[in-house]
């Protein structure tokens, strides 16, 4: 399970160093092989260890290519999916098209989300956190039954 938000730097070649605390688990789970794709609802990227991504691919393969909405999701997720191999220094290379989609520059937030990471431009991340907190405080959105039962 991946958790926590860490500021990492993107180098001039488009590589980012995975924090040391995650490297061992990624090497155990996937020999350092990951898949990066776009998020359909947020200006960020999703980075999965290969076994977790393969589960997503199986679900996508069950969607109908004849249904326009399902085909659109397949096209966006699979069409942007890019394999990333962690090198000996713990770095992964992000494709230019993916970096552009998320507006990534030098400073990137690597955010653990259970079985994957989100990759955010640092300033966009902080704005998203602010917006999320503001939405919670204003109670604009009704709580789902699951959220009402969640005790922290």
From Swiss-Prot:
GO terms for biological process: negative regulation of DNA-templated transcription initiation. It holds the Pfam family MraZ. Residues 5-52, 81-124 form the SpoVT-AbrB domain. One of its GO terms (molecular function) is DNA-binding transcription factor activity. It is found in: Cytoplasm, Nucleoid. InterPro entries: MraZ, MraZ_C, MraZ_dom, MraZ_N, MraZ_sf, SpoVT-AbrB_dom, SpoVT-AbrB_sf. CDD domains: MraZ_C, MraZ_N. Keywords: Cytoplasm, DNA-binding, Repeat, Repressor, Transcription, Transcription regulation. Forms oligomers. Belongs to the MraZ family. NCBIfam families: division/cell wall cluster transcriptional repressor MraZ. This is Transcriptional regulator MraZ.
